[in-house]
Every structure is written in structure tokens, then in C-alpha cells.
């Protein structure tokens, strides 16, 4: 059982300053391990996020027959080939990682063996039906707890049928699970999404030699298709810095007077940079320098300086490009001049916690004024001193880091009930923030 780590956060005594790098992108790290295990040959991965979530994925792929070792700063994966994974001898424990659980469900559905998947208390409370229902169309079977929750037994099929599915709600995880099931299916798998979601799966499949066809449909939607079964060839991967992790020092620097920081090597996939666009609309001094391409993904260095922010109206179609950043964006909105409206946040209700409700609670207990109308969050802007509350994080790493950011800029200390789960996505978060001058004392 993980030991809790409460933390009291007081305003930073001076502006944040310096240059830093955030850990590797979590989405790309998960996929690099999974795809390398499905490829034929040896893959070297540089910059892998070594957080608990990603290490669970490494353990799962080892249990399925891949050889995964660490050599210096690199991770080395000896792949099995598509369709050649082997039945695990034990339960696959995905810890806190919904991404790993959902993507791996797609892979397991088209392998002819049985497996059982579980997770921690938080993951076991999250619904899986929006993945298992479309996946079952390929001939696989899923047995879950009531409400479609883990633990889950999966009876994969060696004669997987191709799936054609239109997502009712945009979700990169559901899209990816279906595409991964299609790698070992006979025929063309098609996923249609109402708005474009992060496309790391499509990019990395191409990197490993898979032909993926992407076309535009409707108003901003996309059709993604691939024809299986495929062969994947081992290719080395360089993982860029995670823009979702960069969000926390970015917002902290914008809110703490006198701050001036650089964050190097951050991934700039256009389907992941909605937060940067939004902050600039709010008046943030945030610039991108030294843009380049590494491992098939755009990368750049971010320069961030303290800024007086103004309220913003965020359209719902931007949600997929910043779905993990809404809690820390809401913190920024609480310090802004004027009200902000963050629209179309239904996806937040099925994250590690009900992130919409948890974000509202985080703000309200620290003196901010909020209102929820349907799936929209309204933050009424700065109306007086903030802080002084205790934040219940519900084992949600992003909520915990958002609370820390609020505390660094608030007039009164903020108590965070548990920061232990930050390690799932951002190992070394406190040390990184302290190196910039945050003055956090665990």
C-alpha cells in the first residue's frame, strides 16, 4: 500500500527562475513500449518516462513475452511480433493507468489467449465499457464487475474481425484501443472521431512501418483506417518532454510574480497544445523557441514569464487537445481578471477522479468562485485572497500538482492531503519545482 505524502504549500518567496526539462511524454512512453513489443526486432527508447504508470506497462509487456531491459539511459525492447504475444502467467496489474489498461485491452482482444487485468482502487472505479463494447465486435469477450469496472477477464480471439466504429465522444484512448485491435485482424479497421484527438498512436504506428490512412470528415472530425494483419518493424524512439507535465511549471511561472523560466525539449504535437493556445489568449508571456522534429514529433523550448492574465472562453472542440490540463488551467483562471468559461468537459468525469467535481472543490475550498452549468465550468476570476483550504486529491496526480501550483501563488497556505500519486506521471516533480525556486518542503 502506498504511503500518503501530505504537503503544505506556501507562496513562493521569490519568482521562479532557471532552465529545466520535464519527464518524457506519458502517452508516447506507453505506446513506445507496447508497439516495440509488437514489432519484430530490437527497439531502443530514449527519454522514457520512468513514472509508475509507464513502469506498469513495461511489466505487462514483459508478462506477455517481450524482453525489456534498461541499458544506461535507454530502454531496450526485444519485440515478439504482431499476434505473437504469449498468455500471461499472472494477473496484469495496471496500477493507476487508465491509458495502459484501455490500450492493452485492444491488443489483448486480438490474441488467442485469456488474461485478467486489474488496477489500484482508483482505476478499479473507472468504467471500461466505452472500450470493451466496441472491442467485443471483433469476436473477443470481456467479463467485468458491475458497471464495466476492473478486475476484468479478457478472452481474446485469434480470428479477430475488423471493427468499424464511430466514437460518440472524442477519446484518443478508445480510438487507440480499436486501432491496436485491428493490427491482428483480417480486414480494414475504421474509427471515426467527431473531433481530432491526440494522434500519437497514428504517428507511432507509421514510425513502426504500419500504413495508417487519415482523412477529414464532417466539421473537424477524422476517419482513421488500417488494414491488418500487419507486420511492425523495430525502430528506435526518442520521447519528447510531456506537454501535460510542462503545464504545471508553466502555470506556476505565469502566476508567481517575478518568474522567468525555460522548459527545454517539450513535445509540441498540435493535438496536445490547446493549453498553450489558451494561456496565450489569456495574455500569457509564453513563447516557443528552437522548434525541431525528434522521433517523428515536433519539439521546442518554452520561455515563460510572469503575466497578468485575463479571463477566457474555451470552446468545447479544444478539449481533446488539453483534456489533462483543465485542472491547472482552472487554477490560472482563478487568478485572472474577469470570468472564464471552460466548455465541454464531460470527459473529465471519467478520469482518475471525477476531475470536474474535484477541480471545483479544489478551487472553492481555497476561496475561488465557480459554477458548473451542464459540462461547462465557469471560474469567476480573482475576487480576493486565495488559499487556506485543504485539497482532497482522490489519488489523482494532476489534481495534486494543480493544488501545489495554486499554493505557490496564493495569499494563504494550501494543504494537499496526498502528493504520493504524483509519481505516476511526474517523478521528481517537487525536486524540479524546488530547483526553480518553489521552496516546497515535503
UniProtKB/Swiss-Prot annotation:
PANTHER family assigned to the protein according to its UniProt record, in alphabetical order: AROM/DEHYDROQUINATE SYNTHASE, PENTAFUNCTIONAL AROM POLYPEPTIDE
Organism of derivation: Gluconobacter oxydans (strain 621H)
GO molecular function, one term: 3-phosphoshikimate 1-carboxyvinyltransferase activity
Role, per record: Catalyzes the transfer of the enolpyruvyl moiety of phosphoenolpyruvate (PEP) to the 5-hydroxyl of shikimate-3-phosphate (S3P) to produce enolpyruvyl shikimate-3-phosphate and inorganic phosphate.
Binding residue positions for phosphoenolpyruvate: 26, 98, 126, 173, 355, 398
Biased composition (Polar residues): 1-11
EC category: transferase
This protein's pathway: Metabolic intermediate biosynthesis; chorismate biosynthesis; chorismate from D-erythrose 4-phosphate and phosphoenolpyruvate: step 6/7
Catalytic activity, as annotated: 3-phosphoshikimate + phosphoenolpyruvate = 5-O-(1-carboxyvinyl)-3-phosphoshikimate + phosphate
CC per GO annotation: cytoplasm
Residues forming coiled coils: none
Catalytic residues of the enzyme: 324
Protein name from the UniProt record: 3-phosphoshikimate 1-carboxyvinyltransferase
Amino acid at each position: 500500500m502506498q504511503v500518503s505524502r501530505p504537503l503544505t504549500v506556501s507562496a513562493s518567496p521569490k519568482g521562479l527562475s532557471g532552465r529545466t526539462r520535464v519527464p518524457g511524454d506519458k502517452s508516447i512512453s506507453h505506446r513506445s513500449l507496447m508497439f516495440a513489443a509488437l514489432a519484430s526486432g530490437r527497439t531502443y527508447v530514449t527519454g522514457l518516462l520512468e513514472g509508475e504508470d509507464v513502469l506498469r506497462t513495461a511489466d505487462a509487456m514483459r508478462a506477455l513475452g517481450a524482453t525489456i531491459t534498461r541499458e544506461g539511459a535507454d530502454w531496450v525492447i526485444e519485440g515478439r511480433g504482431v499476434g505473437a504475444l504469449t498468455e500471461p502467467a499472472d494477473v496484469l496489474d495496471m496500477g493507476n493507468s487508465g491509458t495502459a489498461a484501455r490500450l492493452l485491452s485492444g491488443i489483448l482482444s486480438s490474441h488467442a489467449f485469456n488474461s485478467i487485468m486489474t488496477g489500484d482502487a482508483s482505476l478499479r472505479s473507472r468504467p471500461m465499457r466505452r472500450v470493451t463494447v466496441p472491442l467485443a465486435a471483433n469476436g473477443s469477450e470481456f467479463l467485468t464487475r458491475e458497471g464495466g469496472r476492473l478486475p476484468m477477464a479478457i478472452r481474446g480471439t485469434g480470428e479477430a474481425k475488423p471493427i468499424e466504429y464511430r466514437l460518440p465522444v472524442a477519446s484518443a484512448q478508445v480510438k487507440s484501443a480499436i486501432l491496436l485491435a485491428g493490427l491482428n485482424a483480417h480486414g480494414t479497421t475504421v474509427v471515426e472521431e467527431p473531433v481530432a484527438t491526440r494522434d500519437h498512436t497514428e504517428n507511432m504506428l507509421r514510425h513502426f512501418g504500419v500504413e495508417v490512412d487519415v482523412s477529414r470528415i464532417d466539421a473537424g472530425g477524422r476517419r482513421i483506417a488500417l488494414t491488418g494483419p500487419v507486420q511492425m518493424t523495430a525502430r528506435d524512439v526518442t520521447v519528447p518532454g510531456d506537454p501535460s507535465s510542462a503545464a504545471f511549471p508553466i502555470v506556476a511561472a505565469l502566476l508567481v510574480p517575478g518568474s522567468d523560466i525555460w522548459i527545454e525539449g517539450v513535445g509540441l504535437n498540435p493535438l496536445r497544445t490547446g493549453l498553450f493556445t489558451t494561456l496565450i489568449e489569456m495574455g500569457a508571456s509564453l513563447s516557443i523557441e528552437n522548434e525541431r522534429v525528434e522521433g517523428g514529433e515536433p519539439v521546442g523550448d518554452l520561455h515563460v514569464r510572469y503575466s497578468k492574465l485575463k479571463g477566457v472562453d474555451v470552446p468545447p472542440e479544444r478539449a481533446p487537445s488539453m483534456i489533462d490540463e483543465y485542472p491547472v488551467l482552472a487554477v490560472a483562471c482563478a487568478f485572472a481578471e474577469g470570468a472564464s468559461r471552460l466548455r465541454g468537459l464531460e470527459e473529465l468525469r471519467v478520469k482518475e477522479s471525477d476531475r470536474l467535481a474535484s477541480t471545483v472543490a479544489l478551487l472553492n475550498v481555497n476561496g475561488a468562485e465557480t459554477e458548473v452549468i451542464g459540462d461547462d465550468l465557469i471560474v469567476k476570476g480573482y475576487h480576493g485572497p486565495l488559499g487556506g483550504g485543504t485539497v482532497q486529491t482522490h489519488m489523482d496526480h494532476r489534481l495534486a500538482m494543480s493544488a501545489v501550483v495554486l499554493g505557490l501563488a496564493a495569499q494563504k497556505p494550501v494543504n494537499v492531503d496526498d502528493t504520493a500519486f504524483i509519481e505516476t506521471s511526474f517523478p521528481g516533480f517537487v525536486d524540479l519545482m524546488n530547483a526553480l525556486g518553489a521552496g516546497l518542503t515535503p
